[in-house]
Structures are given as structure tokens and as C-alpha cells.
Amino acid sequence: DWQALSNPFEGMVESLDPEQRKVFNPADYKEKPFANSNRCLCTASNNTEVCTRCVDVCTTAAITVHKQSVLINDDCRKCGLCSAVCPTETLSTRRHMPRQVYDQIARVASAYEQCYVTCTRALKRIPKGNEVVLACVGDLSRDLWFSLLTDYDNISVYLPVGICDRCKTTTGEATYVDAIGTAEEWAKASVGLEVDQRQMTHELTRDYKRSQFVSSAIHSAERLVSRTTPALAGAQAVAKKISDHTKRIDEMQRQLEAAVGAKTSSNRQRMLTQSRKLVMGALQHDPGLAKYVDLQAPMFDSARCTACGECARVCTTRALDLDTNGMVTVQNAFCVSCGACAKVCEEGALTMERMDTEELIVPDEVTERIRAQKAKA
């Protein structure tokens, strides 16, 4: 057992001091979401019928929209489904933002042969190093699954047969089935499924072990006067991979805003959601997948438009812009395919049609520069 060899004193400490032994508490993996009402499509339009995704998925009717506020009462089960289905990220949690969850799963998938995503009801014990526990597997959105599938092929869901049938979060199964199914179609890859805990493997990857071994051989003398350890070397390699991914996404956003502008014609700041950043990062990594990504965006018919401004008002990501000449333009990168603009347009000047997802691909400047240099040579 490589893990036991890496940390031989862990079990000894727990046996000597029972108070130090961790106890599984499902509440540790759950978190009540908070709302940024300024992003809500219903508050922006003063119409609760414009978007009902969070209300529809909530099994306890804990979410209400009152005037300009999104309210979450104490009946909330802390399942996280509302944040997963909200297109504008109005609802979110501090420990389970899309990029945080991506980093957590990517860190595990990079270090272990197999990464397991599961829920508190399924596991019922302290998770091992390669087990990511959520309040509900439906807490992961379609976009997050897509981003993970483009980068890793060793992610599985662990759910025993029938576990969802007895769950009070009755909308959870349908939510994760839809999210994973769509992500698999887009990524042309699949998420594994494990139903038997006895069949789960907890081995570190060969690359991770190799980095520890090489560090041990090279730095054996240095470790006498420093804190460098073989185990730390493997962790540092994984951390660098995650850090590089974050830097790549941040740089991609900078390039996007430089190309199309970070603000609308009325000087309002556009918002690129974390989920959309992950999708665009995945497409930058593998542009060939763009043709499989099925998203919608509003198409504008100027002959029907009265320039009332309702569409621009309801678009909280500011993807849609209505200029002083009465022309509507849509920046697809910022459009979350919510359809709210088309719903509030009484004249039918906006209709939702398939988006040209090629527009979501932001060329990597470094890669393009290297390609240009090779072409000259």
C-alpha cells in the first residue's frame, strides 16, 4: 500500500489518541447557498416566470424571489442543485464554486489511477484520498463535467444501486443524469460508474509515484537540511498542473475581453461565468470538440425590434447589447443560453437558435506564436 508507506504514522497516532480520530459527519460536506440577486434573471425582469430553474429543482420549496431579492429559507437541504442549474451563477456556495470543484477533482484525478465522485449517503464514511464527496452528485453542472471529461479519463461516479431511490433530494438523480449525459455527448468521452465499494481502487498513478521516487533519489542529501520530501514532490507536480490550468483560463479571459471589449456600449461590465470559463478553457485545449457542443444564443430580427430595451435589461451577464442606433448585438462567449431575452421580447425580435460554438474558442497566444515560428522555419 503506497499510501501507508508514504505516511506510516497516521494509523499509529489515531490508535494512541482516539480523540484525534476523525468522525464522518455529512454536514461537513453540505453548505447553504447564498444569492447574488443582481445576477438573477427574475429580479432583472421583475418577472418570476422568466426563469424557474432553481425553484423547479428545489425539493423543499426553499427558494423564493420577492421583489428584487432571491431568498433562501431554513428548509434548504443544502444539496447544491440550485447552484448547479442556475445559468447566471446567482446561487453559489463558498466552498463549491465551479472552479474550486474542478481543481479539487482535477487534483485527485492527476494523482490517483481512479477518481471517485460520490455523495454523503453513498459513502457514509471518511473519504479516502481519491474520493470526492458532495452533498449530491447533481451538484456538478453540465459545463463542469464537460471540462473534466476533456482533461481526464479516470473519473467515475460511485453510487450503489438504488441509493437515489431512497433519497429525499428527489430531483438529484435526474439532475446529474442530464448533466453527465450532455457532457458525455459534448466531450465524446464517458464517466465511469462504480456500484460496489469493494471494487474501488485507491492506487496513486505511476507518474505520481515516479515523481516521488525521483525526488527521493535526487534530494536525499538536501532533505537533511530542508523540508523537501518525496511525497511533497508529487503533490507539487499536481499543484503546478492545476495552477497552469488556472493561469491559462485567466489569460484566455484577458484575451477575450481585449478582443470584444469588457463593457457594453452603455459602459456596463460584462460577466464571464466560471462555468463558461471552464467550457472555453476545454475548447481551447481541444478545439475539435466545438462542433459537438450544442448551445443556443439569441438571433436578432431588426424588422420586429422597437428598441424597448427589455432584452438588454434582463441580460445580467451583459452578453446582449442594445446600442443607440437600436441594433442588438450578442457576444456568444458571455451568453449563457438562458433564453430570458427572447422570453421578454413581446415583438418576437429575438429567437433562440443554435450558437456558433467556434466563437467560444479563444486562440492560445503562446501556442499560436510557436506555430508561427515553426512555419517560418
Predicted features by range, described:
Residues 47-71, 77, 81-99, 310-327, ...:
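Iron-sulfur cluster-binding cysteine motifs and their immediate structural context
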Residues 61, 137, 202:
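Glycine- and other small-residue-rich loops at beta-strand/loop junctions that grip anionic moieties
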Residues 336:
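Extended, alpha-helix-rich binding/interface surfaces that flank or overlap catalytic cores
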Residues 1-57, 115-120, 200-206, 215-306, ...:
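Ferredoxin-type iron-sulfur electron-transfer modules and their immediate structural context
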Residues 1-32, 38, 42-47, 84-198, ...:
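Flanking helices and flexible, charged tails adjoining ferredoxin-like Fe-S electron-transfer domains
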